From Swiss-Prot:
It is an enzyme of class 5 (isomerase). It is found in: Cytoplasm. It catalyses: 1-(5-phospho-beta-D-ribosyl)-5-[(5-phospho-beta-D-ribosylamino)methylideneamino]imidazole-4-carboxamide = 5-[(5-phospho-1-deoxy-D-ribulos-1-ylimino)methylamino]-1-(5-phospho-beta-D-ribosyl)imidazole-4-carboxamide. It comes from Yarrowia lipolytica (strain CLIB 122 / E 150). SUPFAM superfamilies: Ribulose-phoshate binding barrel. This is 1-(5-phosphoribosyl)-5-[(5-phosphoribosylamino)methylideneamino] imidazole-4-carboxamide isomerase. GO terms for molecular function: 1-(5-phosphoribosyl)-5-[(5-phosphoribosylamino)methylideneamino]imidazole-4-carboxamide isomerase activity. GO terms for cellular component: cytoplasm. Keywords: Amino-acid biosynthesis, Cytoplasm, Histidine biosynthesis, Isomerase. CDD domains: HisA_HisF. It comes from the Eukaryota. One of its GO terms (biological process) is L-histidine biosynthetic process. Belongs to the HisA/HisF family.
């Protein structure tokens, strides 16, 4: 059954909601929907109090480690951490209280998928559960009617398509997938229905781990839409539309109520 999953996006040490396609090395290009006055720990506590499991904390660029550590400390062993994760720092983040590390760019040196990097990471984390601690982020952009994994803050397209074969290949070495539809991220103009439908089909056909979709969710009905399109196989994250992130389209309390109602 489709669940609401939370997010805490951190940029320059603050919790923010941004337009995904505008995240580059230059802050001049950045389009921001929301900058929180509350610290990251406030949002961690909010998710904890409402039992929004599987929430992810994403570090968007440098200067975010301290804020991310504060978030993890707010709900130890329950929040996933992503952004700049590699084999040198993954163990540190697990020790700091992350339930999972989320990896993207590290797996794609020179924009090409390197499976050895994933298996090496799995081996490093073996004392903590190995693959059960890894989420692979296959954030993607549309190209020629397909979805191509995008890295480097979603600016660089890789050689890897998001499809059933890719999911099956990676599933042997991870516990979950996180998929941001970067083209619609932060726009609140609706989810990529075609991608969600396909994800549901691929998950139904193969023995694949859970998938969380993020990007474009604009009203509470999107939870029911994702449930229908994916046959309950895909979970949904809300960002800029949520009232706790300054949005006026979706109430956080309604999302929590959905989880309680659907998962009694």
């Amino acid at each position: 059954m489709t669940k609401f999953r939370g997010c805490i996006d951190i940029h320059s040490g603050q919790v923010k909601q941004i337009v995904g396609g505008t995240l580059t090395d230059s802050d001049a290009d950045l389009k921001t929907n929301f900058v929180a006055t509350q610290p990251p720990g406030y949002f961690a506590q909010l998710y904890k109090d409402n039992n929004v499991v599987g929430t992810h904390v994403i570090k968007l660029g440098p200067g975010c480690d301290e804020a991310a550590e504060e978030a993890l400390a707010g709900w130890p062993d329950h929040l996933q951490i992503g952004g700049g994760i590699n084999h040198d720092n993954a163990e540190k983040w697990i020790k700091l209280g992350a339930s999972h590390v989320i990896v993207t760019s590290f797996l794609f040196p020179d924009a090409k998928l390197d499976m050895k990097r994933l298996t090496d990471l799995e081996a490093i984390l073996e004392p903590y559960g190995g693959k059960k601690r890894i989420v692979v982020d296959l954030s993607c952009r549309r190209k020629d009617g397909k979805w191509v994994v995008a890295m480097n803050r979603w600016q660089t397209l890789t050689d890897t398509e998001v499809n059933k074969e890719t999911l099956e290949q990676l599933a042997k070495h991870c516990d979950e997938f996180l998929i941001h539809a970067a083209d619609v991220e932060g726009l609140c103009n609706g989810i990529d229905e075609e991608l969600v439908t396909k994800l549901g089909e691929w998950l139904e056909e193969g023995h694949l781990p859970p998938v969380t979709y993020a990007g474009g969710a604009k009203n509470i009905d999107d939870l029911a839409l994702v449930q229908k399109l994916s046959h309950g196989k895909v979970d949904l994250t809300y960002g800029s539309a949520l009232d706790v992130f300054g949005g006026d389209k979706v109430k956080f309390s309604d999302c929590v109520e959905w989880n309680e109602k659907m998962h009694k």
